[in-house]
Each structure stands twice: as structure tokens, then as C-alpha cells.
Amino acid sequence: MAEITAKLVKELREKSGAGVMDAKKALVETDGDMDKAVELLREKGMAKAAKKADRVAAEGLTGVYVHGNVAAVVEVNAETDFVAKNAQFVELVNATAKVIAEGKPANNDEALALVMPSGETLAEAYVNATATIGEKISFRRFALIEKTDEQHFGAYQHNGGRIGVISVVEGGDDALAKQVSMHIAAMKPTVLSYTELDAQFIKDELAQLNHAIELDNESRAMVDKPALPFLKYGSKAQLSDDVITAAEADIKAELAAEGKPEKIWDKIIPGKMDRFMLDNTKVDQAYTLLAQVYIMDDSKTVEAYLDSVNAKAIAFARFEVGEGIEKKANDFESEVAATMAAALNN
């Protein structure tokens, strides 16, 4: 039987990423054959990964990487926040973002087929990471954004990498683009403009807003406060030319009823129309970047601020770890019951 030296174990660990005991055991089982030991560890890693495949991985990190005029943001998941801080995991996330920005895959299948600097595919890297780290490690999603030479990327990560953002801004500079990305991280817009919102979505969100007003009015009635008006519109998409014209006519009628001189109406109407737009675009303000109040200057929307500095938001992508993933929340009694049931069935 071949002698299993510390040098052999170290070499196998460097090739496979396995722990000391796993590497030594593999060398013993293969009589010191390095190639067979690597293959054995790979097979065991795949088996370990398969056993963990049905686990929920909702923790993790985002990765952001800029490669010339291409930028990538990725989300990689682990089962626990503790593992998400593991150096090997962080390195995998960053390497994933880099290889995707450079490879520009069209979908997850193409992304997983990309070759890492180590020579393994991205898919193999995740199988090996699951085996060596001991938790299910999964590549969830990515977004690619491209720009021209004249445009600027804003790359930003927040909360230790749990949120990753890339934005593209035309005009301004990299610092402005980064500020826009910071706004996106904080305010969570889902699309750039109201033109991207679905009509039924707007209708449903408006109904939710009015339901909240209804509940608020019930509370206000208890303390003799006047009721708040319900919203008729929620988005610019609903504000046709006829609606705008009617709103202006209502304002003029209101000014006339108040006895305001007609010669000063032109100074009053713009402000009241701005208020009308603000009150009737609440859905836009919640979900569209351009309509949100800019966190760096709360006197303006993002669109108005960018206009004031001769800049324009072109595109963005925002990932937050775990969004949309349903986490399992078993209590201690449930875990004990599940363990006992499994033991009885074996």
C-alpha cells in the first residue's frame, strides 16, 4: 500500500478543495493515486450536493463586476448567513460575477456552462462548493447591462453585499451614477419608467392604496379628524390629455370660486398641477425610479434632478438576496417530530 504523506494530502487538497480528513481518506481508498482520488472526491461531492438539493438556500450574497462596457450583478445563495461570510463563498460569488460579465451568457444554463479560471465549469464549481462548505450553495440569477463609451456605470453594494445594484447614466459622471445606484438600493424601484408598468398591476396597486386610505379614515373618524380623499388615479399611464385638461379646469374653477384675480392664475396653476400629479402617481412613486423622490435631493424626483444636471437614467438592475424565496420556518417541536418520524421509518 502506498504511503500517504502530508505532501500528498496537501496536493490533493489544493486540487480539490477538500478538507484534510476527506483528502486523506480518498488517498487511502485509491492507494495514493492522485487522479483517482480527485475523481473519487468529485463523485462524493456530487453525491453530497444531490442530498442537499431539496434544501432551501435563501441566504447569501450578491456580486457585482464591471468589465469594460459590460456589467454583471449576480445572486448566489447559501443556507445560512454564517456561510455567506465564508471566504470561499465570497470568492465564488465574485468569480461568478466576473466570469458572467466576461462571458455574457444569455441564460442560467449558458452561465453554468462557462469555464472558471480553475478549468471547471460554473456548475461544477457549485457542486464542489456544496461538498466542501457543507451547505447547499446555489447560483440563482444574474443580470447583464451594457453601456456606450459616453455613458457611466454606477456599481454599488449595500448591507454587506446583500443588495447589489448596477445603473447606467448618460451625462454626469461615475460619481453621479453611483449616487443613483445608492438611491435604487434604498428605495427599491422595480422599473425605470411608468411606461413599463402593466395596466392591471396599476389598477390592483391603486385598489390597495385606497383600501389603506379607507382603514386610515376609520381611525380618523374615531378622533373626529376629516376623512382623506380616495385616489382616482395611480400612474401617469392613467393621466390622459383629457384628464389633465379636466384637472386644470377644476383648478381654474376653484380659483374663481375663491375670488382669486385671473391675472395671477398663471402663477398658481403650475404648483397646483404639480400637486395633482404628485397625488395621482403614487404607484409610479413606489415602483418606478424616475418618479421617486431623490434621496440626495428630496425637493426633486430622480428624473427632475437628473434633468437639472443634464443627465439621464438609462437602465438599472437591483438584486436583494432571498427576495421571492419562500423560507422554511420549522419550530423546534416540528424539527424533533420530523427527526423521530425519520428514525422510525428507517
UniProtKB/Swiss-Prot annotation:
Region feature (Involved in Mg(2+) ion dislocation from EF-Tu): 80-83
GO molecular function, a single term: translation elongation factor activity
InterPro entries: EF-Ts_dimer_sf, Transl_elong_EFTs/EF1B, Transl_elong_EFTs/EF1B_dimer, Transl_elong_Ts_CS, UBA-like_sf
CC annotations in GO: cytoplasm
Main location: cytoplasm
Location in or out of the cell: Cytoplasm
The keyword Cytoplasm belongs to this UniProt entry's keyword annotation: yes
Key words of the record: Cytoplasm, Elongation factor, Protein biosynthesis
Pfam families: EF_TS
Presence of keyword Cytoplasm: yes
Record Gene3D superfamilies: 1.10.286.20, DNA helicase RuvA subunit, C-terminal domain, Elongation factor Ts, dimerisation domain
Record function comment: Associates with the EF-Tu.GDP complex and induces the exchange of GDP to GTP. It remains bound to the aminoacyl-tRNA.EF-Tu.GTP complex up to the GTP hydrolysis stage on the ribosome.
PANTHER family: ELONGATION FACTOR TS (PTHR11741), ELONGATION FACTOR TS, MITOCHONDRIAL (PTHR11741:SF0)
Family (UniProt): Belongs to the EF-Ts family.
HAMAP family per the UniProt record, alphabetical: EF_Ts
Name of the protein in its database record: Elongation factor Ts
Organism: Streptococcus pyogenes serotype M5 (strain Manfredo)
Name of the gene: tsf
